[in-house]
Amino acid sequence: TVRAILVTHCHADHSPLAAWLSAASGAPTVAFGPHGDDAWDIGEDPVVHEPENDSASADDPATEPAEPTEPAEPVVEESTDRDFVPDLVAVTGDVVAAADGWVITGLHTPGHTSNHLCFALDDGEVRTLFTGDHVMGWSTTVVSPPDGDMAAYLDSLRVVAGRRDDVAIPTHGPPIPNPSAFVDELIAHRLERERQVLDAVRGGLATIPEMVEVLYAAVRKELHKPARRSVLAHLVKLVDDGTVVVEGSTRPRLDATFRPH
């Protein structure tokens, strides 16, 4: 018997079949909510002549965490399922399914998307966290503005690291034993990339394409387009932190010029 259909977020490889399964089974869909509104215009990518691989994305292809798994391929960047609306809305701590001896609760983890929801299973013996795309077993996660938010992503990673679950089950990649240690590495990796972006701005690199050419020099050119989205995500956080300024704009854009504060 299908009791509930748990949806982590509404990218096209996650939510589109949920309504069909709900109609076939009679079980409700459960999620944090529909896709968030785009908060601002991130502008057009200023690089127009470059090899492209539309099926691939590099959230940070140059320095992926080495343990416990090493990614073999770039992350697939999903399109958004803007038609998805859950039957039931769940937030952190809400019980979404339960029976004798086990319970599943929601854990809101914005960052990859604003509506990303993990699901925690506790059967009294093993604490399992279904992490969706928030923590993946084969690569780091795409954080692509405007719906993707690096500051929120880091905060959500810290929440997961502090839970001390026994195992994490991602939607991409193998199960992750000792997920807290794995997530600590993800946090360190992102903060190191943030430091590199800040150093690049302080060193006189003013545009995102310039930064990507330096920071991702060892990465295939067809991955530079998604890498620019990742650098933008870091710059959004640095601007909000007050360490970087956008020239002539209130919000960072792909085609903006940046300088140190």
Question: Model-found features: residue ranges?
Answer:
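Active-site HxH/HxHxD metal-binding segment of metal-dependent hydrolases
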Residues: 1-99, 126-127
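Basic nucleic-acid-binding alpha-helical/helix-turn surface characteristic of O6-alkylguanine DNA
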Residues: 2-3, 167, 197
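Histidine-centered divalent metal-coordination motifs
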Residues: 8-14, 112, 172, 234, ...
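Residues at the C-terminal ends
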Residues: 23-24, 162, 240
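Metallo-beta-lactamase
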Residues: 49, 72-88, 95-96, 102-194
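C-terminal regulatory/interaction regions
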Residues: 199-261
